[in-house]
């Protein structure tokens, strides 16, 4: 009996480890490229044309950038944890979508809190390094995601979750948080 129980715990531990690995892959591929790889490429391609200077650490802009950093990290971490705890076998990555609509945690207040966190982190980078090219990358990424969500992801979510998603979409903003949580 104890051997079977040990096997069960070992199997469950392997499943949890595989799920954590899937989430690590999602974080590494999606936000990792948006926040690190692409800004580094932009930096190396534009370093001769633009000067990159850290902003004065005593300036108001520095504290504004810190606010973007804190809120961005908080939203991103809270969103990923909520996905992890409520997403079943799915992940935030499009290659393994969740099987049920997540309306918990930050998703009660806005439909795309994880992406909003990434937007804030890109703004943090562009302000901290006084970088117009990285700010332009933020604008391209922001507009591209709005286009993608409106024209592709929302259609898929309506197909997968039907009226539950349309009710949620009609009552919860894409990026601007509401003051009260969404209730079904």
Locations of regions flagged by a protein language model:
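Extended, alpha-helix-rich binding/interface surfaces that flank or overlap catalytic cores
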Residues: 112
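Membrane-anchoring alpha-helices and their flanking helix-loop junctions
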Residues: 1-104, 116-184
């Amino acid at each position: 009996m104890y051997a079977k129980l040990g096997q069960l715990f070992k199997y469950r531990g392997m499943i949890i480890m595989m799920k954590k690995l899937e989430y690590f892959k999602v974080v590494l591929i999606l936000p990792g490229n948006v926040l690190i790889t692409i800004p580094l490429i932009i930096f190396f391609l534009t370093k001769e044309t633009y000067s990159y200077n850290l902003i004065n650490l005593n300036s108001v802009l520095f504290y504004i950038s810190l606010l973007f950093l804190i809120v961005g990290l908080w939203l991103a971490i809270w969103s990923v944890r909520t996905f992890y705890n409520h997403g079943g076998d799915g992940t935030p990555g499009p290659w393994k979508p969740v099987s049920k609509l997540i309306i918990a945690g930050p998703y009660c207040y806005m439909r795309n809190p994880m992406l909003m966190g990434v937007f804030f982190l890109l703004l943090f980078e562009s302000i901290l390094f006084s970088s117009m090219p990285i700010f332009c990358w933020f604008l391209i990424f922001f507009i591209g995601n709005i286009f993608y969500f409106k024209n592709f992801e929302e259609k898929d979510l309506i197909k997968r979750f039907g009226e539950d998603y349309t009710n949620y979409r009609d009552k919860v903003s894409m990026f601007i948080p509401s003051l009260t949580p969404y209730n079904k």
